[in-house]
Amino acid sequence: MAARSIASLSLSFGLVSIPVKLYSATESSSDVRFNLLAPDGSRVRQQYISESSGAVVERSSMKKGYEFEKDRFVVFTADELKALEESASHVVEIVAFIPEKSIDPVYYDKAYYIAPDRRGGKPYSLLQQALAESGRCALAKWASKGKTRIVQVRPSADGLVFQQLLFADEVRSMKDLNIEHVDVSASELKLAMQIIEQGTEDHYDPAAYEDEEKKRILAAIDRKIEGKQVISNERADVPAEGGEVIDLMEALRASLRGGAKAKPAAAPRRKAPEPVAGMAEATRARKPAARAPKSPAEAPAKVRARK
């Protein structure tokens, strides 16, 4: 599937302006996500409850407040917060060129790719090659989602990486950990260097490492699907007093067998016997049939789509 751009930008340095498209460098859709379900298998909704009254608060009536003292807030309206936001701009202004290795990776935030847009191929390639030759990267300002961000534009073999950076106050200092530095002997250091040399590789190969936990979860999901340990949302409206799903289906079969002695369901709207509360609607909608419907457990298991 072709990559989809998330923004059209203009990378500006000096009198040169490069039209580019922005792409996310990571794939969040590959994550394994679970839904929260009620005991009957239906989805649940999140509600916000007032701590003072216990009443449900609708999102449309909520306010935003900053707690400056315990249980004391200053409240802002949506318009007040909007006025404080930075105006979004498609122009990414390069403000400096610095050695690429001078940025500690601890400041790396979200990573993007940028690719040339129409008529941007030559200046894009020029910037990519110039950065690679110089061993430098570009620092730029980018106004997005109401906030100005600092980004690093660095070259790679295939193009330019657009790396969002954290601000200084977003990164903790290791000095706060008060790490004690202990002297080591020359022989200890030599032995450690030998161990490092023994395990040295030329480069990092991402394909050599896998998310083992994700693999175990996906395998467990497949086993449950193949074993038909599946809760269907189609029966989420059945009252709880009907019992477990398997008991409910047995009761339905029994009701159909008992009703066949009296009169087959010639009129689809006629009520069938109701040994289990709440089953009248389920039997009323069935077409006349000489045999019981298949149990959901007999249906082929759904195959989980993998990306």
Swiss-Prot record:
With LigD forms a non-homologous end joining (NHEJ) DNA repair enzyme, which repairs dsDNA breaks with reduced fidelity. Binds linear dsDNA with 5'- and 3'- overhangs but not closed circular dsDNA nor ssDNA. Recruits and stimulates the ligase activity of LigD. The keyword DNA-binding applies. This is Non-homologous end joining protein Ku. Residues 257-267, 290-307 have a biased composition (Low complexity). HAMAP family: Prokaryotic_Ku. Transmembrane segments: none annotated. Belongs to the prokaryotic Ku family. Homodimer. Interacts with LigD.
